[in-house]
Amino acid sequence: MAYARTIGTGPAGGTFTGRYLVVLGDDLLGDDDGPARAAVAELTGLADVTSSRDLSGPPGADGVHPTLLAELGVAVAELDDEHLRNARADPRVLAVEPERVQRALTGSPTSGPGLSVDYLRGFADAAAFLRDQAIGNGAGTAVTARFADTDALTWGLQATGVDAASETGAGIVVAVLDTGLDLTHPDFAGRQIEARSFVDGQEPQDAQGHGTHCTGTAAGPLTPGSGRRYGVAHEATILIGKVLGDDGSGTDAGILEGIEWAITSGAHIVSMSLGADVEEVSPAYENAGRRALDAGVLIIAAAGNNAERSAGNVGFVGTPANSPSIMAVGAVDADLAIADFSAASSSVEGGQVDLVGPGVDVYSAWPMPQRTDSISGTSMACPHASGIAALWSQRTGARGRELWTQLTDSAQSLPLPTGDVGAGLVRAPGE
């Protein structure tokens, strides 16, 4: 069964696939997935329940998807009304929620047709913000950016102190779950990259651009050359999980499969520049984030682009970034002002912005033959934080929750509301 079909938009927001995510209690989980498998069979009415531990390859290989993601404690299945009622009433089940479609949280002036509304909105808002900067928001005063790209460095690497850090990310594994990577890109030559696709019928090759750009920011070329450096943790090991298709969208099931694969493949940090404009917390993503932290893995996600601050709308952090156990990253511009599109904290538990990173007019890799591009979004801020997390992890050995605290404690305080920027601007280790 393909994961890409959609059948409607629900009252709580987001596009639904018609399937459900069943979050199992910890009592069913362990080294033996037999109890969880039996419970899922009973709850769904399925005669045969495939566990992710049954698969010799990664989930999604050869079109085979597990019903049970054993490491995350989440099952994915269609439920009729009777089984849905029974699952929601079962004490072994923490939650049952509809499966949604998530989208890349950015926009690009060079992207092709078929992009989502959220994708295009991110670029439109960013473009409006840059225009407002140029004219001083109508006040007749031009704004001079505090940072700017140079021939040697992007403004984002300068603003976050990456240029002064001695760490390179060596020995740290960063998984980027996105639209894949342009595996032919010369800037990634010489790297040993493990790439997997969790999108039916599509290879890990990035035909969209978003994943290549985010991977470029998080890591970039293995050895920064004579051109402008844009990658943060250039010696980190990269895992590429294609969880969003060439149209920039993907299902919860595919994304959760990617998270589980990243954890079991040894990732220390998982970077996810994706989401949906849904304010309620997803129990499935919260369970995944919590179990990742328990395993010493930090998941970092883009806060969202649903704000239009110039029109008085501050937006809200969407799923999955609003999960209490997933770090949410907002965006600032080169003057360290909050980006017009960057979502603010919401009142739901976990719905706060934890950090901000460079997210306006960010220069990074782009699929060939273009090679590079500058685009905007909280998607661009997220991999800055993920790459810097790798630098800190290399320096201190911090993992999981300890690494989360390291990032927030070392952030640069900004003269902006904490609801917009959290602990402040993510900063690389200093001397």
Per-region residue spans from a language model:
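Structural recognition of the beta-strand scaffold that forms the well-ordered cores
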Residues: 21-22, 76, 173-176, 216, ...
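Short glycine/threonine-rich catalytic loop with a Thr-x-Gly-x-Asp
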Residues: 15, 206-212, 248, 375-387
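Solvent-exposed loop/turn segments at secondary-structure junctions
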Residues: 28-29, 83-84, 100-104, 180-183, ...
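Autoinhibitory propeptides
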Residues: 4-11, 52-151
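Subtilisin-like serine protease catalytic core
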Residues: 163-194, 202-253, 265-269, 279, ...
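Extracellular S/T/G-rich loop segment that most often corresponds to the catalytic His/Ser-adjacent loop
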Residues: 178-180, 297, 318-394, 398, ...
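Short glycine-/aliphatic-rich beta-strand segments at the starts of folded cytosolic domains
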Residues: 14-25
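C-terminal subdomain of the subtilisin-like protease fold in secreted/lumenal serine endopeptidases
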Residues: 68, 229-233, 240, 259, ...
